[in-house]
Amino acid sequence: MGDLDEIAPGSQPGLDWREGGVPVSTRFDDPYFSLAGGLAETRHVFLAGNDLPARLRPGFHIAELGFGTGLNCLALARVAQVPMRMTSFEAFPMAPEQMARAHAAFPELAALAADLRAGLSDGTAIRVDSDDFIHFDNPTELPVL
């Protein structure tokens, strides 16, 4: 059986926590963001690397594999000048408490992060800084759209 057979609905990641509040996947031995500056990494790789601030237009839709802590989403929401659409797939979603611990490393994103976590608790649609954000935790629980 492959790795996908090990993914149970509602599976949460196994996490270790490194200095500075960096979550590290015990399954993949991989930090969720840079140990030396997660937000700087996100701004360089995700935002600048994809030229997203300049490319973001009404109707532009971003798809991502691995939502993780939601740092890419939060960083983009912080700079977005138009409503953003983002779809992300996560096999091992973090619990809101785990996200809160990870988000503590980014005080400048605190308000957006709190809105994100509040909406994730019911696993449906949430509003983040006046934009719609839809999060589905588990494909077996998806509503009919």
Features from the language model and the residues they span:
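Rossmann-like AdoMet
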Residues: 1-63, 74-108, 131-133
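Conserved glycine-centered beta->alpha loop in an early N-terminal alpha/beta scaffold
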Residues: 66
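Conserved SAM/SAH-binding loop
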Residues: 69
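S-adenosyl-L-methionine
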Residues: 100-145
